[in-house]
Amino acid sequence: LKLLGIVKKVLGAI
């Protein structure tokens, strides 16, 4: 799992 990818998606969603 790419945690960094998930974090980036969350940051982009904010």
Swiss-Prot record:
Tissue expr: Expressed by the venom gland.
Family as reported in the entry's similarity comment: Belongs to the MCD family. Mastoparan subfamily.
GO biological process: defense response to bacterium; innate immune response
Entry keyword set: Amidation, Antibiotic, Antimicrobial, G-protein coupled receptor impairing toxin, Immunity, Innate immunity, Mast cell degranulation, Membrane, Secreted, Target cell membrane, Target membrane, Toxin
Residue positions where Isoleucine amide is found in the record: 14
Task of the protein: Linear cationic alpha-helical peptide that acts as antimicrobial peptide. Has antibacterial activities against both Gram-positive and Gram-negative strains. Has no activity against the yeast C.albicans. Shows moderate mast cell degranulation, as well as leishmanicidal activities (IC(50)=36 uM). Has no hemolytic activity. Its mast cell degranulation activity may be related to the activation of G-protein coupled receptors in mast cells as well as interaction with other proteins located in cell endosomal membranes in the mast cells.
Sample GO molecular function, one term: toxin activity
Name of protein: Eumenine mastoparan-EM2
Origin species: Eumenes micado
Compartments it resides in: Secreted; Target cell membrane
GO cellular component: extracellular region; membrane; other organism cell membrane
Record's keyword annotation contains Membrane: yes
